[in-house]
From Swiss-Prot:
It is an enzyme of class 2 (transferase). Its EC number is 2.7.7.6. GO terms for molecular function: DNA binding; DNA-directed RNA polymerase activity. It is found in: Plastid, Chloroplast. InterPro entries: DNA-dir_RNA_pol_omega, RPB6/omega-like_sf. One of its GO terms (cellular component) is DNA-directed RNA polymerase complex. It comes from the Eukaryota. It comes from Mesostigma viride (Green alga). May be involved in RNA polymerase activity. GO terms for biological process: DNA-templated transcription. This is Putative DNA-directed RNA polymerase subunit omega. It catalyses: RNA(n) + a ribonucleoside 5'-triphosphate = RNA(n+1) + diphosphate. Belongs to the RNA polymerase subunit omega family.
């Protein structure tokens, strides 16, 4: 039996495209997302809170919601 996904995959794709389009350097953006997801994963492990959303997807959603993702802007 398939489990229901608690988030919309189309929204994550849209958000990731929004992040990529706003970045002047995709490598730096990719590293920021990966590092933040890695931190979230370890925080989740330490607090024993296990989310059904993978850390990378949660990080993309958080970065778009923060409105601080524009640190790496196009000029």
């Amino acid at each position: 039996m398939r489990n229901k996904i608690p988030y919309d995959s189309k929204k994550i794709l849209y958000d990731s495209e929004l992040l990529l389009n706003s970045a002047s350097n995709r490598y730096i953006l990719t590293m920021k997302v990966a590092n933040r997801a890695n931190l979230r994963r370890y925080e989740e492990f330490e607090t024993m809170n296990h989310s059904s959303i993978k850390p990378i997807a949660r990080t993309i959603i958080e970065m778009v919601d923060d409105k601080n993702f524009l640190v790496v802007k196009k000029k």
